[in-house]
Amino acid sequence: MSDENFTAGTFVSHIASNDSKSLLEIFSISTGVPILYQIKHQFFHRSGFVYASEFQKQHDVEFSKFPSLGEIAVQVNSMKAKFDIAFVDPWHEIEDSFQIIEIALKQLHSGATVIMHDCHPRNPDLRAVSAPEVFPYAWCGSTWTAWSLLTQALTSDFSWMTIDADYGIGVLKVPETKSQQKQLMRLMLSLSKRWTSGNLLRPEWS
């Protein structure tokens, strides 16, 4: 599969085996929706959620009809279903990127896979912290920063990788044991809290 055709959406289809029967998708309206149509695998159960960030709601009245990520969290975490794969593409701020992983982790089976888009954009312009004034426009923002902070904090007990294609595809396996799952969730909550309180430094690009 060439780099030109290897996208986050096609990667989801590629790794989905007969054992991967369910897919959870959570997207920001401006950054993730087009990828929905790249996923060709036929899942037995597929649930998708689209939200608008507070920034989007404040700058364009059209986005006010979409729920916030907090409202999406309530919807997703009220489901009884558990999923084999979660594919997330957040509004590209660190807070949203951390929160969307937390939401997904709560709804996944042991051994499931989290896939996040825009985790390694090589073009420095795409890594601009500020959102572009006009969409559609290629922008990866600080999602790579959140992914980097997470993976740097993980011990060797956790399985993850970053694929250098389609602006970077982050892949994280949900641990098999309950103790490690709780450890991962505690880490996510700690990173989010430390970033919000200003006690976490932004990593250098590498």
Give the location of each predicted region:
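A short alpha-helical cap/connector motif
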Residues: M1-F87, W91-S206
